[in-house]
Amino acid sequence: MSREITREELSAAGVQYGHQTKRWNPKMKSYIYGVKNKNHIIDLEKTITHLNAAQKLLEFLGSKQQKILFVGTKRSGKNAVKEAALRSGNFYINNRWLGGTLTNLKTILIRIKALWEIEEEEKKGRLSLRTKKEQIKILKEKAKLEKALGGIKQMHKLPAAIVVVDPKGDEIAVKEAKKLNIPVIAICDTNADPDMVDYVIPGNDDLQESVNLIINILVEAYAEGAQIKMNPSVLRTVAPKREPRQINRPVMSSENQAEQQTSVANENVQMTNEPVVQVAEVEKPSEPKAE
């Protein structure tokens, strides 16, 4: 059984911090707790619930020895997806997504074969028999292929699921997976479109600590199902003691604090007239008006 997730660890990683309210996607309103200084605060209870669902899927896929593709091409996810894949024997893409990676896998496999052939030529010493000019050209091609395909060069068939750090930034990857009915698990910040994702995980996708923690929770679930022992993650999962995206703590009188203060993972959330989701006393958001 996958490990229990606590609000405290999610809060320490900064998972709750969403984007500025003006940058939100209204489809994410059911995952939002409130607003703090014009920034949305994500409901961590929803995050835990959806993480639990994703854990169950990955644990099941692991038990069937199915392979997963981790996708994180934005800075906050590059290290997390690579580490997760290497620790669990899965695949990753942390540079630009090549169109057709899933939908045109046959062509991608041809390019992967070219990478293997260059590596084989190096290994057997045949590369050194070529001219310097040829060697330079071949090694440049190898570096290019390794950067684009190094994380999937062992992937000979479609993955059973993909885990995406930013479904908005890696929209092409998500669309390809959906077209092929491959389940999509994704961290959805408040500016994301959850309709494109099968397993929505509401959370901050910009803080490395937030991404590291969520990806680590997911890969641990896979390892649990696959019954493999992984090395501990070396990535940090506790955010610096500052609030990301310049979210400043609201200054309120003690009287107003008593009336307005609510807690989201020990953080003061300022309730404003910005659209927010009803959670306890939080006002429901109004639908966006047509222009």
UniProtKB/Swiss-Prot annotation:
GO CC annotation: cytosolic small ribosomal subunit
Transmembrane segments: none
Species, as recorded: Mycoplasma capricolum subsp. capricolum (strain California kid / ATCC 27343 / NCTC 10154)
UniProt family annotation: Belongs to the universal ribosomal protein uS2 family.
Composition skew (Polar residues), residue ranges: 251-270
Protein name: Small ribosomal subunit protein uS2
BP GO terms, sorted: translation
InterPro entries (alphabetical): Ribosomal_uS2 (IPR001865), Ribosomal_uS2_bac/mit/plastid (IPR005706), Ribosomal_uS2_CS (IPR018130), Ribosomal_uS2_flav_dom_sf (IPR023591)
Domain of life assignment: Bacteria
Primary gene name: rpsB
Coiled coil: none
